Amino acid sequence: MFRFQSELLLRLQKQFLSEHEAEFKSIEDLIETFMTQYNRGDFNDTIEMKLRDLYEAAEEADTTEESKKFYNQILALCPDEVDAKRELIAFELHPSFQLHQLQQLIESLKKPKKMDWHIIEARPYMRCLIDMGMIYLEYNMYNDAIACFTPVFHGDKQDHSGFLVYMMVACCGAANWDRGRKVYQRYLACC
């Protein structure tokens, strides 16, 4: 499972910064205040921290049914939480159903103005594309996998999402040697 719970903390931090920026002389003081309040537990009742706890519980659950229960609790708390939807889709047994559900999820999302891993709001969209690419790759549908991976390739220059190895496999499977070489060079630069 891709670990994205830290993004919830980043969302909380971003919200805190936007609300309190004018109150501080320096960004360092602002961040220090945020961290002090975070460490003191001042944010424990926020939606972001509740979501984090539910994601962790879902990840640590002993059964699929228990995990599903936690993901559904996440969606009850925050119906637009894309990553909970992704995780529920992953539990579906048939890959064609997973692909259909992921395609519907992608279509329901607002495409990011810029595909960039450094933009937190773009990451769920990019993860959906990676999920689809992985299913296509599993069924040797290499060109479809490449089509899913390509926008992420352009938006995740340092391979934070860890998909470059899979894109190389897709390029080799599709006998797309030139693109595969470029992906391999990027992979070497990231390591």
Can you describe what each PLM-predicted range is?
Residues 84, 128, 161-163:
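TPR alpha-solenoid repeat register
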